[in-house]
Amino acid sequence: MQKKFLITTSDIFSISGQKQFEKIALKVFRFQYENNLVYKKFCDLLKTDVQKVKSLQQIPFLPIQFFKSHEVVSNTNPVQEIFISSGTTGMITSKHLVTDVALYEESFRKGFSEFYGTIEDYVVLALLPSYLEREGSSLIYMVKDLIELSNQPESGFYLHSHDELIAKLIALDQAGQNVILIGVTFALLDLIEQHQFQLQHTIILETGGLKGQRKEMIREELREKLCKGFGVSAI
C-alpha cells in the first residue's frame, strides 16, 4: 500500500521556478523515504533526520552503485520497462525499473516541447550506433518515440550508413527543412571527419559517449570541433 507524501504529475509538471522546484524536490524526498525501502534504509544508516531536511543540499543522494546491486522502486506496481545503463562487456550495469512508462513519456515529450517547440515541425535523425546495438536503452526508447511523433517519412535511425545520412542532411537543409540530429559523440565526430557541413536549419543534440571509443576531450574542445564540423553556432 502506498504511504503518505503522494506525488502527482501536476506537482512535477507545474514547476516554474527555483523556489517551486526546491519545494517539490523536498516533497519527492519525503515520498521516496516513505515508499522506497532501499532509499529509506540508506537514509536510516546515514542517521538522517527526515524532519530536519529543509534544503536540497541536505537531501541524501543514493549512489549509482545501488542501482547495480538493488531493485530501486518506490511502489508495488508491475514493472513496465527496465532501462539498462551502457557499459563495456562484462561490466555490471545499472537498472532503472519503470512502473509508469506513460509518466516517462510525458516527461521527455514536455521537455522537448519546452525547448524546441512542436515535434511535427522537425525531421528527427538519429546516429546512435552503440545504443542501437544493445537492449534496454532509455535513449533509444525516447528517440524512437520522437521519430514516430514527428510523423515525417524522412525521420529515422542510422546505424553505419554515413553516406546516406550525409546526403539526407544536405538535402533537407537545402530544402529549408528543420532537422534535429541526435547523435552519440564518437559517431558525430566520425561523421564530420567524413564531411564538413554548413547547416542552417539543423539542431545537433550530442548525447555523450566517447569513453573507450576515442581519445577523451575536454567539453570546450569537443563543442568547438562539433560546431565547426557541422557549421552551427551551438551544440
Predicted feature locations:
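Active-site diphosphate/adenylate-binding microenvironment
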Residues: 18, 34-84, 92-97, 104-120
